[in-house]
Design a protein with these regions (language model features):
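Active-site helix/loop of acyl-thioester processing domains in fatty-acid/polyketide metabolism
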Residues: 38, 75-100
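A conserved, well-ordered hydrophobic junction motif at loop->secondary-structure transitions
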Residues: 60-84
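HotDog/MaoC-like acyl-thioester-processing domains
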Residues: 1-8, 17, 113-115, 126-157
Length: 157
């Protein structure tokens, strides 16, 4: 399922343009629904109340970076890699009807990301505290973890 992009984000130069590749990124929403059981004591006997909740929040996309994203010859530029992490994590929040802005973002680089070869970006919600949301993401190419990131976002309303 494609992730919905809020109306006020439709002009984003990263999300709505071919910033990393020849066409805009199409983030896919991935979620697992699980039935959670809550126990409440009612009149001296236990009753189980079942409720369905989304327990995993994840967004992913596959792209083939072009020379638009090139830094050193044949290698994706580090700032653009970080931008890709930021975009994926934001779309993970969009998946969960949260509009937010980046507060902090830390990227780690494990292996160079080759231009012209498919990569997969995955972002996952970790937790929220009040209006701050914690997320993490990873970029995998040829089965190798090439880059990882952690971020905090602040709800915009």
């Amino acid at each position: 399922m494609k992730v919905f992009i809020p109306h006020n984000h439709r002009r984003c130069q990263v999300c709505s343009q071919g910033f990393f590749a020849d066409s805009p990124i199409c983030f896919e929403a991935v979620g697992e629904r699980e039935t959670l059981v809550n126990h409440k004591a009612l009149a001296n006997h236990e009753a189980s109340i079942k409720s369905e909740a989304l327990v995993k929040y994840e967004t992913r996309a596959k792209i083939v970076p072009t020379d638009k994203a090139e830094g050193y010859d044949g290698i994706m530029q580090g700032g653009i890699v970080t931008t890709l992490h930021d975009s994926a994590m934001l779309h993970c929040l969009f998946q969960n009807s949260i509009t937010a802005m980046t507060v902090s973002l830390t990227s780690r680089f494990h292996h160079p990301i080759a231009i012209g070869k498919e990569l997969e970006i995955r972002a996952q919600w970790v937790k929220s505290r009040r209006s701050i949301h914690f997320l993490e993401s990873k970029i995998i190419q040829n089965g190798k973890l090439c880059s990882s990131a952690q971020s905090q976002f602040m709800s915009s309303h």
